[in-house]
Amino acid sequence: MTEGAIRIEQIAERFDISLMTVHRDLDELEFRGLLRKSRGIATALPSSLVESSDVFRVSQQADAKHQLALAAIDLIEPGQAVFLDDSTTVQQLTGLLAAKAPLTVITNCLMVINELNSVRGISLVALGGNYYNWCSSFMGRMTTTAIEQLRADVFIMSTAAITDDICFHQSQETIDTKRAMFDVSAKRILLADHTKFKKRALYGLAQLTEFDHVIVDSRTSSDDIDRLRGKGTHLLVAPETPGLIA
């Protein structure tokens, strides 16, 4: 719930379902620690128990994500094979890739597939597997097996959280898929907006020093920037885009 809190009656009206159904579903979410029910109001709780859905994430830090994409596109060369993960940050790249054609794009993300399937000069390799609706992507053993048979010039990804200068996600399936892409790519690029340094998740993927480039947005704190550079991270600060950052 993007509003943070909502009356239970509003949920029933919005989705045209019974109050009994709403209460049953909210009870399950409350049991999982994702919200609190009190006096007819459901309130979302901050949580690292699950990955957020792409529908929610796509609207979060949209300006910063576009800033990161504009910086990342300069690291792609025509003729390359490029892995793209299922993050909403990397999805900002899809509208920019035509300028780098011809390219081969390999992805497990349904939204990226839909964006690029008719773009001239883009050869698209779609990875199948078990479909996960919350992130609009395919993951699982079938997906990682297919990835292991491929080799790419570049892998571009984002992450749910950065703790102790390590990328973290809350889903083991996400970790397995991204690590497989990471391992078969010659160059690895991480896109991370400033909010990722304030979040936590369960499963570690890679240290930031393992990436060839870590791109952060202009609102990243000077303390984070200085610390990362002091550790030898190949850090790029995306320039502020006029008209995008308030």
Language model segments and positions:
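Conserved phosphate- and dinucleotide-binding cores of soluble alpha/beta proteins
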Residues: 2-10, 16, 31, 111-246
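HTH-adjacent hinge/linker in prokaryotic transcriptional regulators
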Residues: 1-83, 87-88, 94-102, 106, ...
